[in-house]
């Protein structure tokens, strides 16, 4: 079994970093439609996400802004990837993770692939379902904190988001040790 893992929210100043791990049950017929989630329009991501969820074993892991502040974003990202894999509860012979660094995963072979979310189908799939899940989470937070425009900025440090922080203050879900806060 081959597993792909990716994260989303690393560059955000609000909310968790979220990782997904994906193992296809069998090679899906939509494989050629997969791409890095950042390159896909929202509607296409959501469509593919539903197909991925139907045709794969998958798991997610979120690491809160509180933990990010304690262990830093790099370590939090690796922990999210490790936890997503552990949550799968599968023994994979090969695990691909997006990026330069390998999390602590007990699999026969674990490889970090730079730009893996554009190269490895399982990482592409993980990228898509992670982005869709985190975007939906930000949409829910937007209902609670509408002045911060989270539906639009998804927690990233846009000009509007930074202006909202200046005007309304830092929320408990902001990553307080990020330089932009």
From Swiss-Prot:
GO molecular function: manganese ion binding; RNA binding; RNA-DNA hybrid ribonuclease activity
Catalysis: reaction(s): Endonucleolytic cleavage to 5'-phosphomonoester
Pfam families tied to this protein: RNase_HII
SUPFAM superfamilies: Ribonuclease H-like (SSF53098)
Needed co-factor(s): Mn(2+); Mg(2+)
Compartments where located: Cytoplasm
Cofactor note (record): Manganese or magnesium. Binds 1 divalent metal ion per monomer in the absence of substrate. May bind a second metal ion after substrate binding.
Residues at which a divalent metal cation binds: 6-7, 98
Gene Ontology CC annotations of this record: cytoplasm; ribonuclease H2 complex
InterPro entries per record: RNase_HII, RNase_HII/HIII, RNase_HII/HIII_dom, RNaseH-like_sf, RNaseH_sf
E.C. designation(s): 3.1.26.4
Keywords, in A-Z order: Cytoplasm, Endonuclease, Hydrolase, Manganese, Metal-binding, Nuclease
Limits of the RNase H type-2 domain: 1-181
Primary subcellular site in the record, as a coarse category: cytoplasm
Gene Ontology BP annotations: DNA replication, removal of RNA primer; mismatch repair
NCBIfam families: PRK00015.1-3
Similarity comment text for this entry: Belongs to the RNase HII family.
Function field: Endonuclease that specifically degrades the RNA of RNA-DNA hybrids.
Full protein name: Ribonuclease HII
Organism expressing this protein natively: Borrelia garinii subsp. bavariensis (strain ATCC BAA-2496 / DSM 23469 / PBi)
Gene: rnhB
